[in-house]
Amino acid sequence: MKVHQKVVSKSKGSDSRSSVPHFDTNASAIKENIIHHLLSFQGRDPERSGAPDICRALSYTMRDILVEKWIETQKTFYAKRKKRVYYLSLEFLIGRSLMNSVINLGIVEDVKQAVADLGYDLTEICENEEDAALGNGGLGRLAACFMDSIATLKIPAYGYGIRYEYGLFNQQLVNGNQVEMPDSWLRYGSSWTFDRPMPIFPVKFYGHVTSEADKQGNYRAKWVDTTDVMALPCDMLIPGYKNDHVINMRLWTARASRELDLSYFGRGDYIGAVESKVSSETISKVLYPPDHNLAGQELRLKQQYFFVAATFQDIMRRFKKKPKSFDMFPDRVAVQLNDTHPAIAIPELMRLLLDEEGLGWEKAWDISTKTFAYTNHTLMPEALEKWTVELLGKVLPRHLEIIYEINLRFLEQVAQKFPKNVEMQRHFSIIDEGPPKQIRMAHLAIVGSHSVNGVAELHTNLLKTRIFKEFHELYPGKFNSKTNGITPRRWLLQSNPELADLISTNIGFGWITDLDQLRNLEPLADNAGFRQTWREIKTANKRRLAKYINEHTGISVSPDSMFDVQVKRIHEYKRQLLNGLHLIHLYHHILKQGDEGIAPRTVVFAGKAAPTYWRAKLIIKLICEIGEVVNNDPRVNGRLKVVFLPNYNVSQAEIIMPAADLSEQISTAGTEASGTGNMKFSLNGALTIGTLDGANIEIREEVGEENFFLFGMTAEQAEFERLAPSRTPKQVCENSPEITEVIDSIAKGAFSKGDKQLFKPLVDSLLDPNDQYLLMLDLESYLECQRKVGAAFIDADNWTRMAILNVAGMGKFSTDRTIRQYSEEIWGIPVE
């Protein structure tokens, strides 16, 4: 194995074990190390090994290199005694790691050569890696992009989450119905994660609280008679881009405090003997267990506290390595809460400071509020997390006491600001009096943090003026905006290498770490030769997606058609149903008037619905049934194709995004916090049809209004329509025979083999005057805008020009910019 011993100079307090192996990264050394891992780690004969074996061995080889750099990075952290960031997220949707690591290490050509010497192609090898099932949607993918930028900007930080054994679920489509299967991403193990024998932390649940006096006579709470679960750390390494800086995500796995209860086993009760083990380890099995019943809700709460409690024991362990006052805690520790899932961390830190460290309330609260910052990710009131007082008191009795005390002291502040205003106190309270009584986790996160940020300018303004208006009045300096971004390393350099090469050849490589340099593409939009090459690359990407579609669905699509794409979580507010209505309208138009003047389209959907979200699953069914009718109607003659790709994930997105011509970002204005899919599509040269929602507004500002297809109401207009409707869905139908025909065709069973009841719930929701997502009120505008899209696509040269200008305007939407703002404006850490 090609390893050199690198002697590391010893600093005071270091020992003789401080030498770190140095791994050569030339092609011959990489090849030798691949062979070593085939033999030593897998027991495989190199001459009989297949692509999956090579993939695993290459992954271990890359991990060896990363570990070396990670150890050096950690030494730098400790030597400089810098403040560290702890990013707490229930999701990290990182996708595949192999190609990303090869690119960020800057050894692509050497790895290609090493793999070629073994008779394989690197791209083919990378296809054998499983996506890490550690997240679901935008929340987790944002966290993953953040980790990439944190490493690239050399910020001392760690990501903390859960190592899910099965992730969310593997989505299969059976007769158009979503079927959830286990996502067994770890069935062959993972080359990228490694278990740590230490530190292992106990996490407490249930029990009750007693009290005793300390030596000074002060009240001290004791949480006793608990059920304990052990948290085992598992690390996954994240490299920065060509900077030798590697950080880690620490993911926790739940294990029983006792593997086997021998008393049960001895009595022949074999199920009882392992019952505790099974119950404990369920905590880290699945992301977002269904919460439609009390057992599911309890498991979700236990998941959230499990990873928070283990994380804070780890933070305390690191903080205490050298004796120091807890007054220094906020100077050494910054904790970012990614949504409300980890908000239970606020009472947990208070518990540690009060009960374990013996601090007084005022001191502990001052330390805690200076430590935490909270990112809000939703404008949907129903998505603002709440736990019943009964459940939280059962699972975490001490934390409920602390939350009540936080609330009591907070409401005293409110009373000073709004004296004798009981209604205002009720509105502010962390405790919703119900019934049932509930803990408002967003309120807890706001009260317990020094910073609350939205993730787009519109989102933040709506938080200040609508969702948390009173909190903004009480804490005017606490709310701020940090528009989301994406990492260009993953979403252009890796996923679209041909386009990345074209860009680098013409404007240099600086854009990879300074995305603002894409502005230098603007003059090239008027260069005919550049546009032609751009189109050729787009066509090649579309051929790749067409091949993928055929392999996974059996549907043949033409790369010459417009690839009109909507891929994201299936939810009513994201309005996949609106897209479906346009499909039916377009289908009717082709049947009546032929295809003259209509740009051929392939409309691609992908995304998962929550297992218990039956209406979202019904939308999937309708889209699949529309496809079944349209794709098999000879009168359409291939001018319109509908595809629903199953099991959407990061790797699938890396194929879809570069191939898209049109990006559907059509949520009801005022419902999407930001979105990042919109950014990924634009960065890959897709034009957007969208509403003035989330980051769409800022994308439109950056790429130019003339290069964005806008439709629909604004957030203000949408809110006005909900409060004082100017028209009803039925009136929309009465004024448009075309729209009436679309709705009637669904209602009469045209897409359900004559079954008029199957999609009746969707028809009823469309015609409901109280439809909060306002599909029918935006439909006319959407159909008209789609006509403009079709006409624009026919002029291929101008479409390409618009696509180039979209890419040129994407500089703002790098997570490098986002993380720099977090670091300097929230965490108080200057970026070099």
Where are the model-predicted features located?
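A conserved ligand/cofactor-binding region detector
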Residues: 2-832
